[in-house]
């Protein structure tokens, strides 16, 4: 029975264990991570699982009773069927959980598929789970798991696989998963792939590596490439073979013979050799370290001997230098001899080439003669053939007409045959045939020889450039060698001078040594005599003795503290390392102070002994302070240790508590076990199960507690012991340092006693001298500091070439940024009824005059249930207005529990009471309050949100000022803005004189600008750091704040290391949503050195500028078709996609806008700026040279993503000034700027002639312009400016202002009102009225929608359009309240900016003199420079917007975008500008400044000289380096930069000549200076200043030939002695410095210019001219040729038509072609002109026309000069009307099938750019 009971218990426990394990397993299986068919899986719960655990289990039947297969025993004892969805026939008794699920299923009821399988085991077909088809179900399944979504299978691929069905290998792996048996393996490129990639790049199918780096090759980049040798796998040191281009061993580098193949099987030898070499290198390093460790010091007493040996050594080296100099001189002589021998060879080669050319011409002539003879022979043969044919025809004729007998015929035939044989045998024919064959052979031979000579001649000519280049390099090397020799001579002379100086110094030292001995004797006598003179310092010495005694006491206390610390060390468990380190630092400082004192004590300077005594006193005080600080630090460390010990004790207490609970559980389990002993078998089994569970839980709890204890001990006490040990070491070190200090300071008493004996006779005059010196220094500083401040201001106003001005500017920027950040702190302040805040208004008072709006969040304290004194019904909220508070103000208050808005415009208050929602009924969270004033109309808004929904309660109340005033007339110095209360010395007006506000308050906006309480001027009775603000709930009106960011035009965000969230791949994507009304702004920016990427908004359209190191320069991607204008105050989704490292795509609102291809380059950036960037980044040289825009973004952004990964911009550490949310008020366009050709229009329901009132601000410098216009039939209502007078015209009745100076650039406010009795016009505060002639007549009110205009009108010919700004417009409407117009909502906007109005100021003379009657905008606005002002731009080169009118027929602008005051040189050898100058410009000192940008290595930049070029000054490029040179008498001073500056970036260069010294300053950082001895000769300059090049034949005398040719690049901002040089007297092949992409072609600029071809081209009686053009204007001269007798040819365009005019000496005749396709469409078009005597044909693309002129009986074929692109007017005949020069590009110019090179033209005059043509 006992055995049976035991077995039953074991069986019950086993069943319980199985149930627990099954439950745990099923629980784990429930964590299925995928959403199937878009719905979440909800687990089912069996009722038995939720049964009470305390139910008695006596109903469970004995274990021997089993249910059938497919059934399980429930707790009630019944058999129930298993619910396993047909996937199992076994389930667990009690719970019904299924066991042994089949068909790849799992779960409590086999209702789910295993990972890697998919199907519907419950309802699906088939009814079992199949392997995931990723990509193949059974044979190739590479998915972790899969699921269905939207009817499709989604695979979760393994690590090495990608694709919707895992059908591809991931990047960095290769293989073909679709091929059965194939898997994805990792790429193996031996570590020689691109290190910038996160994986090795190989073919995704074969695994062959792409782009092997480090000079490697092979399938896996496993060996060095041909021509290299080394270890490609391990050492990765493949180096170039040194075999003269021949092959070498790929491992050792040994040179091999041609065709030699490296045998296989030598790998072991190579690796053995590599190991031996490595061991040899290690032994060499050991030997080297041993040699370096050998000491080479010398004794001090042998210093003189060593000096003599050094002199001897220097003399030896001097002789070596002389020998080297002699050797160099011999080498130079040899080089010169070699050069002399080389020059005859070159001349011989040239002579041989000439002889070959002459022989070729002779052979050609003889060949032509032979051909003529052969032609003559052929003609003779033809004549003979004709005669034979004639004879034959005659024979036939006579044979037919005469009947001959057979005998006669036979005779004749025999005779004919004889004649034929005789003819054949005649000698002349044979001789001529042989001669012809021989001459033909000789001609062929001569022709081949001529070809060979021609080939040799061409080869010889091809060698000329190489030889010349070698000669040039050799010449440069000789120059460098000469300079090196000169430098060596200088060094030799310097060494000789140093030797002499050393000798003299040695003698001086010996003499000084003797004098020192004598002075020492004198000093000894003085010391003995000064003992009696020191009575005054005696008191000081006694005080020092006292200090020493105190220090001794302090050290005793330190010893006591040390013992106390050592006693407490045993209780320490943790100690702060930082505090101990600080104590050690203090001890170290003590050591330093002691050392300093010791040095002072050992000094023998008698005149400083008193001061040293004072220093010693200060040192003692410092020692005492440091010791006390060390004690405090130690005490602090002890306190921290005690706190940590208490914390550990608390943890021990918790552990003991848990242990007691465990014991209680154990006792309960034992009691249960005791009770279970008396129960039956079922109870025993149940009890055993419960006891086992309790024991298991107890054991688990104990294990957890033990683990916790161990972790605590390991983490805390172990670390504490370790730190304690460290602390002991530190304290011991501190004690040792303190002991050392004591040892050092102990001799002080002895030294002081010595002082007392030696300083008795010291004179006290040293004190008086020191005091007088200090007084004089203070007085001097007092005088100098104001002067320094003045100089600081002066330096700040000058050109920022120094770091001081930049620092000042940076400080100001930081202050502005700080204020900007403070204005965006969206946190409330708690006001207690006594506090107040004065806020910076941030908005100009001019902007507040006509329109004022303030919004804020308020949370007043709740009203108590019972009246108390704490709650106040009347409270002051805010005040904005004048300081005198009598008029011109507005405010907000609470009166009688209601919100009250008060404003005053000069006479009386207007109070608007919002009584529909008492303040006491507001909820206990923030509500929005907004007060607004438009003119005389006021309004207060209240928005009360709801916590439970997005619904809001809105309340509004309106009011109106009854007087005539409409402006809030404030001045900046008289304006204050108080919130919550006012200071005690400020008196509020009576309507606002209430108790201060109690509660929380937060400012939101002021006139649409974000504002904050934390941007305060002063705070009163408040500490913001202690006053806890109220938390603002995220209610309905703030939901949008969390997802969007606001940029105010000065803020920006920076995301560092964007690759931490995503990687650059085949497709790189940036996404962002923006919302803005601005025209311009910087959206995204990435910079890395000279490479950059910029996404900008210009005039409302997107532009992308980027350069990833492209060889062709930056790429510009723009919305040329104007598909997406984004400055409409709506959100637009922008995507930048970079595909396959070579294609940039711009997508807006998921629509493709533009794309462009570029050179294949990866994105080289890791950081990105959003919405703007710091000024130091925007003003960098890279961005200044390429980016036209540096305006930060203003508006809202959200959803910034990189590779579809979101970034929270406010969490970035360097984000500056970015605010939460997107305030709607900040996106309203209340202002519009008109340029004289623009207007805006809208259609609304407004009655302008009946009960109308409207107003607006305007600001302009133009005296005339249409401000507002409306028409209804013949009735017109308009407001305009006429000669500075405001005129209102209503149905022909005009009301005019009395003042005529409203075009002064200041803001003015206009209010118009029309009633049935009068018309009224108010300008500022001047009121004018006129009678309504329709008084008493009933007029029907217009209720239909009508169009009205601001700024101009397309239907008003009477008025010119307005130039200036209009803002804050409002109307009285029929359908809504008075409010400010949002111009963004207007339906028609033509060339109008709705974002900013440029601040314009009138010139001084305009304030006293009337302007002209002109509607065009003035050109002398602020920001433009006068003619006399310097044109140097201190910030950088600006982009020049050309003022030339654009041709309406042309797609391209006539003036491409260029840099202001910068010009492009090059293309021809003598491209240049010439400037005239005065003689006084070049005196003893002359200074030039210039900016340059080039990629050329040679070229002339600047040159000026006299007529004979004896006196000269020049700046040029040589081998990429800048060289500044001028003459000093017969010598030349040359300054050459060490670095190269032909990097394509802008550089500032200043070169100065001052008598015989020169200075070269580059970029304000590098200063090079040289000097020559003055010559005394006069320095005179007479010729012009050459810039960019010189005239032919100039500068060759002084500059090497390669640098004489023209500079190729851009030069700008030339200044002479601080004055700008702008007007060139002559220009040759110089154009503005264009920015943007360029292509091959010759560009003729709008400034005019032409090209004169060389003499090898002429237009005579017969020719063909062909060329391609891309015009930028529809008219202009293309080609012109003329002769002295009046004949000419002229090809030009006129309004898109191509015309050819010809005069052949008889009369003019012409033809023309009007192409169907516009020539000015921005594309290339081909034009061909063909002349054959009097016939002229013109081809334009595929269209042809011709003309036949009169014949000239005596034609003369003249050689006429050919002009291209223009012609001087003096050469045009009266019959040929002058035509303007051609503007555009010309290329592929051909005359008679011979291409023309404009770079070799006879003359290039004017603004013509050779071989460089802008494309946009």
Curated annotation (Swiss-Prot):
Glycosylation sites: 39, 104, 215, 308, 333, 458, 550, 571, 574, 631, 639, 735, 751, 754, 780, 803, 1088, 1283, 1361
Keywords for this protein: Basement membrane, Cell adhesion, Coiled coil, Disulfide bond, Extracellular matrix, Glycoprotein, Laminin EGF-like domain, Proteoglycan, Repeat, Secreted, Signal
The Laminin EGF-like domain, residue ranges: 82-131, 132-186, 187-240, 241-255
Laminin G-like domain mapped to chain residues: 826-1030, 1042-1222, 1229-1397, 1462-1633, 1640-1813
GO molecular function, one term: signaling receptor binding
Disulfide bonds: 82-91, 84-98, 101-110, 113-129, 132-146, 134-155, 157-166, 169-184, 187-202, 189-209, 212-221, 224-238, 1000-1030, 1196-1222, 1365-1397, 1610-1633, 1785-1813
Signal peptide: 1-24
Free-text domain note: The alpha-helical domains I and II are thought to interact with other laminin chains to form a coiled coil structure. Domain G is globular.
Function: Binding to cells via a high affinity receptor, laminin is thought to mediate the attachment, migration and organization of cells into tissues during embryonic development by interacting with other extracellular matrix components.
The name this protein goes by in its record: Laminin subunit alpha-4
């Amino acid at each position: 029975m006992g055995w049976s009971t035991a077995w039953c218990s074991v069986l019950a426990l086993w069943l319980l264990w199985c149930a627990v394990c099954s439950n745990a397993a099923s629980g784990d299986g429930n964590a299925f991570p995928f959403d199937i068919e878009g719905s979440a899986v909800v687990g089912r719960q069996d009722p038995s699982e939720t049964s009470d655990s305390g139910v008695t289990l006596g109903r469970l039947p004995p274990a021997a009773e089993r249910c059938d297969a497919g059934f399980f025993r429930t707790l009630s004892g019944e058999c129930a069927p298993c619910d396993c969805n047909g996937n199992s026939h076994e389930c667990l008794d009690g719970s019904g959980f299924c066991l042994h699920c089949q068909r790849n299923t799992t779960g409590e009821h086999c209702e789910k598929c295993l990972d890697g399988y998919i199907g519907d085991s419950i309802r699906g077909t088939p009814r079992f789970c199949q392997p995931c088809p990723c990509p193949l179900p059974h044979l190739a399944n590479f998915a972790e798991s899969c699921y269905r979504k939207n009817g499709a299978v989604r695979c979760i691929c393994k690590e090495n696989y990608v694709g919707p069905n895992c059908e591809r290998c991931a990047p960095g792996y290769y293989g073909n998963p679709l091929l059965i048996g194939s898997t994805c393996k990792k790429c193996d490129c031996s570590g020689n792939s691109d290190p910038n990639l996160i994986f090795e790049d190989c073919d995704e199918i074969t695994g062959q590596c792409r782009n092997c780096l480090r000079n490697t090759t092979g399938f896996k980049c496993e060996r060095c490439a041909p021509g290299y040798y080394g270890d490609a796998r391990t050492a990765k040191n493949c180096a170039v073979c040194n075999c003269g281009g021949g092959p070498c061993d790929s491992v050792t580098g040994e040179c091999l013979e041609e065709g030699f193949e490296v045998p296989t099987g030598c790998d072991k030898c190579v690796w053995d050799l590599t190991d031996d070499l490595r061991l040899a290198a290690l032994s060499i390093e050991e030997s080297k370290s041993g040699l370096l460790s050998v000491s080479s010091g010398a004794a001090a007493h042998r210093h003189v001997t060593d000096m003599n040996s050094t002199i001897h050594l220097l003399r030896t080296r001097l002789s070596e230098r002389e020998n080297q100099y002699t050797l160099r001189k011999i080498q130079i002589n040899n080089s010169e001899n070699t050069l002399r021998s080389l020059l005859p060879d070159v001349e011989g080669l040239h002579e041989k080439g000439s002889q070959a050319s002459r022989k070729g011409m002779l052979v050609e002539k003889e060949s032509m003669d032979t051909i003529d003879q052969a032609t003559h022979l052929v003609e003779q043969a033809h004549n003979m053939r004709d005669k034979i044919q004639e004879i034959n025809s005659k024979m036939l004729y006579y044979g037919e007409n005469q009947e001959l007998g057979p005998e006669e015929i036979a005779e004749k035939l025999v005779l004919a045959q004889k004649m034929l044989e005789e003819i054949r045998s005649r000698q002349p024919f044979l001789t001529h045939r042989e001669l012809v064959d021989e001459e033909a052979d000789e001609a062929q031979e001569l022709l081949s020889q001529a070809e060979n000579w021609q080939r040799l001649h061409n080869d010889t000519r091809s060698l000329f450039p190489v030889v010349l280049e070698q000669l040039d390099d050799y010449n440069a090397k000789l120059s460098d060698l000469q300079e090196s020799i000169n430098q060596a001579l200088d060094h030799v002379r310097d060494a000789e001078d140093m030797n002499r100086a050393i000798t003299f110094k040695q003698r001086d030292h010996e003499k000084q040594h003797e004098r020192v001995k004598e002075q020492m004797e004198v000093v000894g006598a003085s010391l003995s005599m000064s003992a009696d003179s020191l009575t005054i310092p005696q008191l000081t010495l006694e005080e020092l003795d006292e200090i020493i005694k105190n220090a001794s006491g302090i050290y005793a206390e330190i010893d006591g503290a040390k013992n106390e610390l050592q006693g407490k060390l045993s209780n320490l468990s943790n100690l702060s390392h930082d505090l101990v380190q600080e104590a050690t630092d203090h001890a170290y400082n003590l050591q330093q102070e002691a050392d300093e004192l010791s040095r002072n004590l050992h000094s023998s300077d008698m005149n400083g002994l008193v001061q040293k005594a004072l220093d010693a006193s200060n040192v003692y005080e410092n020692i005492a302070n440091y010791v006390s600080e060390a004690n405090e630090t130690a005490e602090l460390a002890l306190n921290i240790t005690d706190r940590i010990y208490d914390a550990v004790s608390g943890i021990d207490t918790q552990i003991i508590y848990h242990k007691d609970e465990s014991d209680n559980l154990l006792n309960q389990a034992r009691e249960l076990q005791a009770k279970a002993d008396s129960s039956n078998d079922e109870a025993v089994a149940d009890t055993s199960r419960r006891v086992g569970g309790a024991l298991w839980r107890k054991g688990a709890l104990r294990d957890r507690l033990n683990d916790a204890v161990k972790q605590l001990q390991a983490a805390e006490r172990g670390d504490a012991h370790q730190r304690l040990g460290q602390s002991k070491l530190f304290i011991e070190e501190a004690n040792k340092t303190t002991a050392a200090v004591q040892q050092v300071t102990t001799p002080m008493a002895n030294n002081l006693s010595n002082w007392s004996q030696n300083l008795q006779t010291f004179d006290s005059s040293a004190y008086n001298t020191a005091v007088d010196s200090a007084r004089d220094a203070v007085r001097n500083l007092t005088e100098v500091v104001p002067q320094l401040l003045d100089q600081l201001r002066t330096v700040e106003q000058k050109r920022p070439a120094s770091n001081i001005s930049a620092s000042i500017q940076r400080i100001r920027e930081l202050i502005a940024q700080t204020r900007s950040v403070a204005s965006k702190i969206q946190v409330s302040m708690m006001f207690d009824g006594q506090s107040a805040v004065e806020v910076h208004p941030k908005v100009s008072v001019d902007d507040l005059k006509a329109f004022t709006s303030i919004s804020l969040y308020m949370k007043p304290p709740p009203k108590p249930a019972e009246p108390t004194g704490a709650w106040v019904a009347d409270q002051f909220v805010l005040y904005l207005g004048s300081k005198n508070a009598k008029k011109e103000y507005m405010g907000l208050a609470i009166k009688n529990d209601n919100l009250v808005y008060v404003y005053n415009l000069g006479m009386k208050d207007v109070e608007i009471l919002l009584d529909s929602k008492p303040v006491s009924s507001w909820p206990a969270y923030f509500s929005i309050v907004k007060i607004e004033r438009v003119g005389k109309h006021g309004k207060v808004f209240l928005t009360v949100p709801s916590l439970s929904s997005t619904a809001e309660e809105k309340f509004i109340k309106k009011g109106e000022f009854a007087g005539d005033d409409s402006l809030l007339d404030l001045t900046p110095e008289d304006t204050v803005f108080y919130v919550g209360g006012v200071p005690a010395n400020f008196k509020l007006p009576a309507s606002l004189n209430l108790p201060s506000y109690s509660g929380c308050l937060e400012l939101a906006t002021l006139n649409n600008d974000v504002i904050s309480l934390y941007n305060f001027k002063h705070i009163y009775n408040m500490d913001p750091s202690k006053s806890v603000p109220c938390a603002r709930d995220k209610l309905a009106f703030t939901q949008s704040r969390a997802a969007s960011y606001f940029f105010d035009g000065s803020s920006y965000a920076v995301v560092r290391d964007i690759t931490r969230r995503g990687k650059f791949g085949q497709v790189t994507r940036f996404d962002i949503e923006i919302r803005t009304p601005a025209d311009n702004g910087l959206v995204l920016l990435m910079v890395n050195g000279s490479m950059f990427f910029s996404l900008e908004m210009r005039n409302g359209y997107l532009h992308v500028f980027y350069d990833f190191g492209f060889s062709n320069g930056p790429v510009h991607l723009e919305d040329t078709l104007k598909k997406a204008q984004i400055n409409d105050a709506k959100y637009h989704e922008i995507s930048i996609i970079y595909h396959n490292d070579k294609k940039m795509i711009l997508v807006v609102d998921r629509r493709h806008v533009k794309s462009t291809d570029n050179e294949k380059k990866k994105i080289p950036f890791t950081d990105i700026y959003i919405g703007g960037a710091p000024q130091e980044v925007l003003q960098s040289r890279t961005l200044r040279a390429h980016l036209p825009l540096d305006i930060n973004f203003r508006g809202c952004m959200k959803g910034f993503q990189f590779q579809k990964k979101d970034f929270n911009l406010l969490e970035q550490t360097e984000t500056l000034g970015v605010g939460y949310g997107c305030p709607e008020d900040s996106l309203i366009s209340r202002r519009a700027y008109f340029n004289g050709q623009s207007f805006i229009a809208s259609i609304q329901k407004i009655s302008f002639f009946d009960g109308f009132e409207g107003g607006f601000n305007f600001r302009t410098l133009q005296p005339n312009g249409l401000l507002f216009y409306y028409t209804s039939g013949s009735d017109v209502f308009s407001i305009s400016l006429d000669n500075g007078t405001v005129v209102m015209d209503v149905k022909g009745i005009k009301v005019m202002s009395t003042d005529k100076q409203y075009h002064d650039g200041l803001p003015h406010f206009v209010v118009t009102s029309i009633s049935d009795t009068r018309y009224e016009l108010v300008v500022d505060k001047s009121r004018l009225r006129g009678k309504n002639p329709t008084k008493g007549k009933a007029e029907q009110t217009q209720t239909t929608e009508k169009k009205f205009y601001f700024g101009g009108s397309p239907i008003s010919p009477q008025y010119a359009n307005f130039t200036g700004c209009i803002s804050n417009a409002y109307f009285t409407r029929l359908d809504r309240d008075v409010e400010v117009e949002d111009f963004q909502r207007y339906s028609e906007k033509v060339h109008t900016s709705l974002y900013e109005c440029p601040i314009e100021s009138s010139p001084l003379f305009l304030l006293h003199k009337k302007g002209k009657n002109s509607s065009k905008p003035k050109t002398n606005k602020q920001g433009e420079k006068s003619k006399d002002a310097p044109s140097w731009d201190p910030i950088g080169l600006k982009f020049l917007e050309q003022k030339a009118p654009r041709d309406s027929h042309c797609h391209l602008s006539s003036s491409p975008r260029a840099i202001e005051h910068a010009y492009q040189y090059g293309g021809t050898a003598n491209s240049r500008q010439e400037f005239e100058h005065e003689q006084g410009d070049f005196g003893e000192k002359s200074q030039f400044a210039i900016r340059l940008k080039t990629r050329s290595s040679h070229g002339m930049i600047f040159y000026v000289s006299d007529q004979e070029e004896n006196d000269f000054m020049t700046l040029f490029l040589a081998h990429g380096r800048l060289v500044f040179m001028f003459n000093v008498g017969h010598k030349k001073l040359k300054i050459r930069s060490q670095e190269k500056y032909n990097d394509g970036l802008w550089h500032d260069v200043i070169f100065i000549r001052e008598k015989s010294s020169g200075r070269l300053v580059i970029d304000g950082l590098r200063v090079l200076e040289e000097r020559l001895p003055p010559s005394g000769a006069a320095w005179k300059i007479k010729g012009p200043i050459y810039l960019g090049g010189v005239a032919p034949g100039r500068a060759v005398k002084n500059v090497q030939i390669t640098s004489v040719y023209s500079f190729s690049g851009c030069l700008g901002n030339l200044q002479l002695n601080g004055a700008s040089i702008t007007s060139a007297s002559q220009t040759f092949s110089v154009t503005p410095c264009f920015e943007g992409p360029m292509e091959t072609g010759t560009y003729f600029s709008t400034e005019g210019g032409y090209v004169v071809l060389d003499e090898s081209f002429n237009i005579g009686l017969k020719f063909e001219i062909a060329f391609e053009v891309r015009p930028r204007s529809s008219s202009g001269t293309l080609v012109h040729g003329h002769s002295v007798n009046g004949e000419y040819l002229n090809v030009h365009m006129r309004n898109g038509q191509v015309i050819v005019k010809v005069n052949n000496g008889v009369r003019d005749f012409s033809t023309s072609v009007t192409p169907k396709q516009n020539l000015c469409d921005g594309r290339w078009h081909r034009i061909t002109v063909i002349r054959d005597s009097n016939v002229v044909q013109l081809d334009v693309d595929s269209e042809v026309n011709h003309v036949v002129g009169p014949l000239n009986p005596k034609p003369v074929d003249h050689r006429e000069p050919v002009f291209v692109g223009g012609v001087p007017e003096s050469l045009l005949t009266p019959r040929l009307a002058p035509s303007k020069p051609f503007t555009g590009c010309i290329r592929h110019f051909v005359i008679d099938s011979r291409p023309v090179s404009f770079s070799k033209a006879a003359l290039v005059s004017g603004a013509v750019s050779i071989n460089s043509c802008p494309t946009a």
